[in-house]
């Protein structure tokens, strides 16, 4: 544990004061108050999440106190602020000590706490660190969703920092990610229909958060497994990013800017993709139908050859059709986990291939695989493309 005392009153130390301003500028404000929406805060006990719950607790406390017309101090109602801690149990007593530490903070701040104990996985505490980062993230995500619904929370606040953003984007880049991955972590994203994940510290450096905690004497826990470079994220954090920063000191800020610009581009493509879905497709049950006649009339061969005709050419652009297809997958609840960029490009090629459009009632899903890759209408997750009455139909088998 880093530090040795807990703060008892709001602190005006320079770094902490800047962090308080930062949280106010990024947290949603409804009618002049940020504390009107019930919020669940994820806290591991590490520095970033400890800083987040302390900052939000101060914000809630400030907004709960005010003056009435007689200039008397009164307490104003605020929405619930709930802390959630997921105990994976992977580090034995250390994991339990993390839980006890988070409970201590919540007791001092008088915040309700909900804890999830994860059942033992196939990787026990004695068999070394768990390397399946995706599984651990999904466990936490599912827990946060359940806890938010249980406590009526609209927002789930998590403590991703600017360093997390840079590490994520580098990880995505070396894996050959698409445009969505190059945008990195979003400041807000949907967890469920009525639940939004918010990341108010996404523009704050990790060292800045630690400096602020030191100024106010607030301790935090250090997870020894964060040093294990068996985790790709830790390898990027401890080896790759420091090497980059040794040559480019402002690399984290530059990567963050690049992600912001990519996000803006993605939003433009998404809007075009939604227009494409509305104009050329229909959904019925587990079927997605692409009306080729509509697409053909809007993008004739003459218009396709005219590069200056941007009003029509966007309809056949691969990024737009890929984005539209991904939206369709999400709308139908189909998993995109095994869909690679090669799959999306193949689907786009079939959609744009007019020779497929005029193949009457022939299932194009019976193609042969070449070099282990199906070049026809079969896609991961049991999704099949066929031609029915000159329409392209995708369905779950």
From Swiss-Prot:
<protein>
    <recommendedName>
        <fullName>tRNA(Ile)-lysidine synthase</fullName>
        <ecNumber>6.3.4.19</ecNumber>
    </recommendedName>
</protein>
<dbReference type="InterPro" id="IPR012795">
    <property type="entry name" value="tRNA_Ile_lys_synt_N"/>
</dbReference>
<dbReference type="GO" id="GO:0005524">
    <property type="term" value="F:ATP binding"/>
</dbReference>
<dbReference type="InterPro" id="IPR012094">
    <property type="entry name" value="tRNA_Ile_lys_synt"/>
</dbReference>
<keyword id="KW-0436">Ligase</keyword>
<keyword id="KW-0819">tRNA processing</keyword>
<keyword id="KW-0067">ATP-binding</keyword>
<dbReference type="GO" id="GO:0032267">
    <property type="term" value="F:tRNA(Ile)-lysidine synthase activity"/>
</dbReference>
<dbReference type="Pfam" id="PF01171">
    <property type="entry name" value="ATP_bind_3"/>
</dbReference>
<dbReference type="InterPro" id="IPR011063">
    <property type="entry name" value="TilS/TtcA_N"/>
</dbReference>
<dbReference type="InterPro" id="IPR014729">
    <property type="entry name" value="Rossmann-like_a/b/a_fold"/>
</dbReference>
<keyword id="KW-0547">Nucleotide-binding</keyword>
<keyword id="KW-0963">Cytoplasm</keyword>
<dbReference type="GO" id="GO:0006400">
    <property type="term" value="P:tRNA modification"/>
</dbReference>
<comment type="similarity">
    <text>Belongs to the tRNA(Ile)-lysidine synthase family.</text>
</comment>
<comment type="function">
    <text>Ligates lysine onto the cytidine present at position 34 of the AUA codon-specific tRNA(Ile) that contains the anticodon CAU, in an ATP-dependent manner. Cytidine is converted to lysidine, thus changing the amino acid specificity of the tRNA from methionine to isoleucine.</text>
</comment>
<dbReference type="GO" id="GO:0005737">
    <property type="term" value="C:cytoplasm"/>
</dbReference>
<feature type="binding site">
    <location>
        <begin position="44"/>
        <end position="49"/>
    </location>
    <ligand>
        <name>ATP</name>
    </ligand>
</feature>
